[in-house]
Amino acid sequence: MQITRRSLLTTAFATTLAPAAQAKLVPGEPFSVADDDDQKVEYKYRKQIVDAPISAAPGTVVVNAYYHWLYLILTNNRAVRFGIGTGKYGDWKGETVVGRMEKWPIWTPTPDHLKRRPDLIQYIKGMPGGLKNPMGARAFYLFQNNADTTYRIHGTDVPEHIGTRSTAGCFAMFNADVIWLYDRVKMGTRVVVQS
């Protein structure tokens, strides 16, 4: 087979495009977690460094449910801001701490879920962690006075819900973002939820 200039250029061009066409994956996960789900929403809901929304110690997590943002407070009055999905059935607010953390958590529908969606009864004993699990790749269980509030910060199986009122009350993040946050937050972290 004769190699022409055209075939050489076509092959070279196609080779440079191939990596861009493939989704970047978060390494080390048991399931394929895309690192580019944030491309599915408005730019303002993508992870970025911004001014801190409140004066708080570095490491504090702040949730602003009204604007669909979650912040991890850094030093020098700065924060990492993430877009989130928030509850469609009311606004809960308050101060909590991270009382439990799970990788690829099991999801169990609450009585409220079952009232709205009786078909979820099949998961009454729990849906195993995975890409179709509504809790996504990680979950932070929010506690007050050593008791579970039933509110969570977790991943999502529907990235397009970020920036919308789409959850049953919890705070949903892109799976890549919640994995990133999980690696930086520890048990007992203060979480301030504003509505």
Language model features with spans:
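N-terminal secretory signal peptides and thylakoid transit peptides that target proteins
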Residues: 1-16
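Residue-level marker of structural boundaries
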Residues: 17-18, 187
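Boundary at the C-terminal end of the N-terminal hydrophobic targeting segment
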Residues: 20-23
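Cell wall/extracellular polymer interaction/catalysis modules
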Residues: 25-116, 131
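Exported/periplasmic cell-wall-interacting domains
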Residues: 56, 89-94, 105, 116-195
